Amino acid sequence: MIFLTALPLFWIMISASRGGHWGAWMPSSISAFEGTCVSIPCRFDFPDELRPAVVHGVWYFNSPYPKNYPPVVFKSRTQVVHESFQGRSRLLGDLGLRNCTLLLSNVSPELGGKYYFRGDLGGYNQYTFSEHSVLDIVNTPNIVVPPEVVAGTEVEVSCMVPDNCPELRPELSWLGHEGLGEPAVLGRLREDEGTWVQVSLLHFVPTREANGHRLGCQASFPNTTLQFEGYASMDVKYPPVIVEMNSSVEAIEGSHVSLLCGADSNPPPLLTWMRDGTVLREAVAESLLLELEEVTPAEDGVYACLAENAYGQDNRTVGLSVMYAPWKPTVNGTMVAVEGETVSILCSTQSNPDPILTIFKEKQILSTVIYESELQLELPAVSPEDDGEYWCVAENQYGQRATAFNLSVEFAPVLLLESHCAAARDTVQCLCVVKSNPEPSVAFELPSRNVTVNESEREFVYSERSGLVLTSILTLRGQAQAPPRVICTARNLYGAKSLELPFQGAHRLMWAKIGPVGAVVAFAILIAIVCYITQTRRKKNVTESPSFSAGDNPPVLFSSDFRISGAPEKYESERRLGSERRLLGLRGEPPELDLSYSHSDLGKRPTKDSYTLTEELAEYAEIRVK
């Protein structure tokens, strides 16, 4: 387009085309507002050899062929026109100058169509030109918006109206442009084919709020009531902005959670829900809902909504906090310690909210923290009393969990006061009670016999452990008369302790050993002594009867521990010592014992008196160990 002051190109083309041929030049299309007028510029030519005295012309509507009887718009020869054009058409050009410009007034929609010109030079020199002009009757201004309007980028919007009526000139104004910018009327412009337009330009920088805004242009004609308005909706492109989203969400484990993300953009955005870089759901939409069924602690965290289109992107995050009961606590630390060392134990768990952590031992609270996931227990200089079972308990308003753990304190053996020896009848039992960790090895030493017995000799030693206390029992048989000294020694990798075991309740044990049988034996010995004295006295007065003689195997009375008939006393002593060595698990020959024997013949009586006790007939023997 060029300004009005420029040389009309159309007329240059007409002038340059003169060459003596039949031809016409007019705009292929032309527009006019209803109720106004329109001037259709036209030029024609004919061969130079034709020199007509008068040149006539005819304008036809919608057909160039007279035989079709098209409506006559204008006819210079007769001035007879179709009724639709009565008083509406006239020729502005001079046909003698080959100017066929036509003016139509008070145009209406039914006048819209094709217009053809026919030259009449007289006789057979008549020619209907194929070139024609299409008239368009309009009612609205033409608002031209750039194909792409981007928020933040300056744009130019134009309003264009036809200005082909020399009698009425349009005036343009903008409607709904408040806040957009001030319009600039550029003026009247000529188009390439010789038609004219009135143009007004509006420059502004659109915002996202301008999207969908109706911008209007009005064409009015002074001194008339004619007004024409046109509108265009602004299609402003802009990047997404997230306008709707959940705030931080708290949910109980196992419940249903919905997260909503809504964005404003043009065109609509691609919405994506993500967590830790993983796409959970996406769609091209203005809003997107993320459904989480039966949430677990693993779904606790930060969720991101990303909105993007060709013009940019936006993102926002929302935190999901899943509330749940504490997990079973885990315990880390030294579970085995040596007496005197410092022990540090860490109890930890996971929950939401953070729990109350407590460490118990035997229902006694040792340490506790509130709303923390870790608890450190410090035990300086541990002792055996610290050994045992502990509990770490975690709780919040959603539940409670606990974990038990054991602390093992290792220490050197300690011989307890319960250790002792006791005699019962012909048996001696020695108890060695040891507290130790780890379990000790226990040995019993008999110094007087140079004998050591340990736990491996199950025939003599029985051991039983209860917690940190080990009880070892040594059993000696046939030792009640002269119980030996017994020393108990307990040993582990942290040391050794020895103790000579005391005999408890010796006098009570002796009478318990004697018991009813011992009382009978003692009474029999007493009767024998009385009988012996009586018999001795009688010997002085009574002559020995020849019929009384000692038997081959007279009855013999030993102590309560040794009762053997028909065997020498020396053999009995040797047998007993051998038995004792077998009791202690010793090998070898028993040592020789120096035994002295004393035997008394208490005399014989020829007959047995009915009042004489059986013991009166017994011999008395005594064995001494030197």
Curated annotation (Swiss-Prot):
Residues 20-516 are extracellular. Monomer and homodimer. Interacts (via the first three N-terminal Ig-like domains) with RTN4R and RTN4RL2. Interacts with RTN4R. Interacts with isoform 2 of BSG. Adhesion molecule that mediates interactions between myelinating cells and neurons by binding to neuronal sialic acid-containing gangliosides and to the glycoproteins RTN4R and RTN4RL2. Not required for initial myelination, but seems to play a role in the maintenance of normal axon myelination. Protects motoneurons against apoptosis, also after injury; protection against apoptosis is probably mediated via interaction with neuronal RTN4R and RTN4RL2. Required to prevent degeneration of myelinated axons in adults; this probably depends on binding to gangliosides on the axon cell membrane. It is linked to Spastic paraplegia 75, autosomal recessive: A form of spastic paraplegia, a neurodegenerative disorder characterized by a slow, gradual, progressive weakness and spasticity of the lower limbs. Rate of progression and the severity of symptoms are quite variable. Initial symptoms may include difficulty with balance, weakness and stiffness in the legs, muscle spasms, and dragging the toes when walking. In some forms of the disorder, bladder symptoms (such as incontinence) may appear, or the weakness and stiffness may spread to other parts of the body. GO terms for molecular function: carbohydrate binding; ganglioside GT1b binding; protein homodimerization activity; protein kinase binding; sialic acid binding; signaling receptor binding. Gene3D superfamilies: Immunoglobulins (2.60.40.10). The modification Phosphoserine is found at S545, S547, S549. The chain crosses the membrane at residues 517-536. Residues 20-325 are annotated as: Interaction with RTN4R and RTN4RL2. The lineage of its organism: Eukaryota, Metazoa, Chordata, Craniata, Vertebrata. This is Myelin-associated glycoprotein. GO terms for cellular component: compact myelin; membrane raft; mesaxon; myelin sheath; myelin sheath adaxonal region; paranode region of axon; plasma membrane; Schmidt-Lanterman incisure.
